[in-house]
């Protein structure tokens, strides 16, 4: 086995017959290996921890748009991070902080930033290229059309944005349909004018940054969108297409751009070029306008959750049951149900009730029979906010300090994957609803494996006309970057190897043939290595068994020139040989 080989072909012989795999597609328009950039992501399917799933699509309606709110402040200036994650189960530190009285020695960690939970990628800095790469890949998988950077506090986060631009451009040059970018600036006109000028000077000015021109979101116009106020500079004023931000607690102007909506069903905003726009958010802090008659921040609703009421009493706080219930339900958390008007932690974790009902507004308008009501653009809040600043009690004339926008996994609004109980369920729900909103259904014929017998000793031109599943080049890059929490060590991950960039599949009725191509030389197999060049297969008739939708794995066991096909246990371990492969390198 020589290191210079970049392609690996397999002949798989199984002890059973496969009808269809979860990621396969035939595209006759692709005639050569180098030319293949087939969007295999369209053909992937998934099932979340709660049994909800989505199917394959053949493409997207390009006259419909979905965007997501993206936050750049993690690690920018916070200092030590306090972790709120699972305070019910682990400790009561944060609750003690919020409930502490001045007479008890004050409220510690005032004005510090608190994480409501931990991302799958840790407490990362927003300029961590390894994390940005993962985010962009997830967005491409999801079919997102645009990303809105949050610069509403006046900062433009130049290093974070530049890193994001470079990686996004890299993937676009590989041939992937990448989401486009725009910025949201402050609702305050004067602050917005300064930000718009800085953003243009740092990222858009064609005299210096022309290479980024293809990355800006334009919709149906020839100008890049920006959410903000014209700064009064003729060049900049004429360069952008401007949308003013709609704040949820101000008078509604349906020509503005909504980042969140405190009405349900959500209001429809109108753009003269795009059409109808609706906000879809994971949760909504409507307690700030006393929607149910009681003022409450997210931390108030979280503190009054059923799991915490004993702790409130232990700190000497006594409230009537009616008041406790009212504060708990004053905000629309992840598990809020618009029918019963109540929150529920189990619904938040298992059903994403609020998020699903927000999407129901979009789908319902499409199904009402009046095409004038159809939604053309959905803006999702949000992806990766993660932190909120602890505010002092005296700032709100209240008995406790508080966190306004985020508190815990019930009262927060991030769809990014969590290390906690939420897992990747909100991301998968996002993908499912995007496909329902603008996906074009895939026919069963389009999902069939191409029928062709491959001679492993023959030339690679045998694979011409068989479309490949194109994967990202560069996604095995190493990670070594500081955490947003200065007290933590760097995040280090140097496990990446064998950067698979294309996988092709065919069969002749008896055997399945695979061609796997890597960006660089394939590393030699080392005895006992169970994770070398693994390929996982899911069979449409066996989705209830195996590991995360997959039932078989190739290459857990290699012996000489023969590798194995093995069943997967629920834990993801190889659990018995069912066939063999004959690998052949080129």
Q: Model-derived features: where do they sit?
A:
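Bacterial signal peptide processing site
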Residues: 25-27
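Surface-exposed, glycine/proline- and aromatic-rich loop segments on solvent-exposed faces
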Residues: 454-572
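Alpha-helical transmembrane segments
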Residues: 11-18
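C-terminal motif of bacterial Sec signal peptides marking the signal peptidase cleavage site
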Residues: 19-23
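Glycan-processing catalytic domains of CAZymes
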Residues: 29-455, 459, 467, 530, ...
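Bacterial N-terminal signal peptides that target proteins for export
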Residues: 1-10
């Amino acid at each position: 086995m020589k290191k210079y080989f970049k392609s690996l072909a397999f002949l798989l012989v199984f002890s059973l017959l496969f009808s269809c795999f979860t990621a396969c597609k035939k595209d006759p328009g692709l005639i050569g290996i180098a030319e293949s950039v087939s969007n295999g992501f369209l053909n992937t399917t998934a099932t979340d921890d709660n049994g909800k799933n989505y199917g394959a699509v053949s493409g997207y309606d390009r006259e419909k748009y979905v965007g997501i709110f993206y936050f750049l402040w993690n690690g920018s200036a916070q200092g030590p991070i306090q972790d709120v994650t699972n305070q019910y189960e682990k400790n009561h530190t944060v609750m003690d902080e919020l409930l502490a009285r001045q007479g008890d020695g004050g409220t510690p960690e005032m004005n510090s930033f608190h994480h409501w939970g931990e991302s799958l990628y840790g407490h990362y800095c927003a300029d961590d290229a390894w994390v940005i790469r993962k985010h962009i890949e997830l967005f491409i998988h999801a079919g997102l059309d645009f990303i809105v950077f949050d610069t509403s506090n006046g900062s433009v986060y130049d290093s974070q944005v530049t890193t994001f631009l470079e990686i996004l451009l890299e993937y676009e040059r590989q041939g992937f349909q990448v989401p486009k970018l725009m910025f949201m600036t402050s609702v305050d006109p004067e602050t917005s004018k300064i930000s718009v000028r800085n953003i243009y000077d740092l990222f858009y000015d064609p005299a210096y940054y022309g290479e980024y021109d293809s990355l800006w979101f334009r919709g149906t116009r020839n100008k890049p969108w920006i959410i903000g106020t014209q700064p009064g500079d003729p060049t900049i004023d004429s360069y952008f297409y401007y949308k003013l931000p709609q704040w949820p607690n101000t008078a509604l102007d349906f020509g503005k751009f909504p980042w969140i909506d405190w009405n349900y069903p959500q209001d429809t905003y109108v753009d003269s070029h795009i059409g109808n726009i609706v906000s879809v958010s994971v949760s909504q802090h409507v307690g700030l306008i006393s929607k149910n008659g009681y003022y409450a921040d997210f931390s108030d609703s979280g503190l009054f959750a059923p799991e915490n009421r004993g702790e409130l009493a232990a700190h000497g706080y006594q409230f009537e049951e009616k008041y406790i219930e009212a504060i708990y339900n004053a905000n629309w958390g992840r598990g809020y149900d618009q029918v019963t008007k109540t929150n529920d932690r189990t619904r938040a974790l298992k059903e994403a009730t609020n998020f699903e009902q927000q999407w129901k507004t979009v789908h319902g308008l499409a199904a009402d029979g009046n095409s004038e009501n159809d939604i053309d653009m959905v803006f999702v809040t949000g992806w990766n906010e993660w932190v909120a600043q602890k505010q002092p009690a005296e700032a709100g004339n209240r008995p406790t300090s508080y966190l306004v926008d985020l508190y815990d996994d019930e009262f927060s609004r991030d769809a990014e994957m969590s290390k906690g109980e939420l897992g990747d369920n909100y991301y998968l729900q996002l993908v499912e609803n995007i496909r329902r909103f603008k996906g074009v259904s895939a026919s069963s014929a389009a999902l069939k494996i191409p029928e062709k017998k491959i001679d492993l000793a023959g030339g690679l031109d045998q694979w011409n006309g068989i479309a490949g599943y194109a994967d990202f080049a560069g996604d095995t890059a190493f990670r070594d970057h500081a955490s947003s929490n200065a007290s933590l060590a760097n995040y280090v991950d140097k496990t990446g190897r064998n950067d698979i960039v294309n996988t092709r599949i065919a069969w002749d009725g008896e055997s399945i043939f695979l061609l796997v191509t890597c960006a660089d030389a394939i590393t030699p197999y080392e005895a006992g290595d169970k994770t070398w060049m693994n390929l996982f297969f899911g069979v449409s008739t066996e989705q209830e068994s195996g590991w995360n939708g997959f039932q078989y794995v190739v290459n857990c066991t290699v012996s000489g020139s023969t590798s194995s096909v093995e069943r997967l246990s629920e834990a993801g371990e190889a659990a018995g040989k069912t066939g063999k492969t004959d690998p052949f390198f080129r």
